[in-house]
């Protein structure tokens, strides 16, 4: 995988802060959320890797970047939500994320977390 240029957009919201990260070539994107009332946790969301780029290490780049950014922000945990039993669920588990609760709004989704400090 070649080096990929990214564009990062920051937004301060009523509930906290959001960082949107998009590859210039549109090969991947993700977002990180930090809520004002939970400074120890970063939420990884909206993860997408373009179909023709899958299996080339982009997912690892996203996780490594997210975990590094979370540490810089002083967080000790990253949380994310995935479809229970999906490929993504298994993939995150292989990368050290553990299930910790079902999603109350949609029980077909599960919350996962990883301690990063």
Regions found by a protein language model. Name each.
Residues 70-83:
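Conserved GNAT acetyl-CoA-binding A-motif
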Residues 80-89, 104-109:
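Conserved beta-strand-loop-alpha-helix junction that forms the acyl-donor binding cleft
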Residues 93-102:
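Conserved acetyl-CoA-binding loop of GNAT-fold acetyltransferases
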Residues 34, 113-114:
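A general lysine-centric signal
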Residues 49, 55-68, 94:
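Conserved acetyl-CoA-binding loop-helix of GNAT-fold acetyltransferases
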Residues 1-45, 50, 69, 105:
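Acetyl-CoA-dependent GNAT
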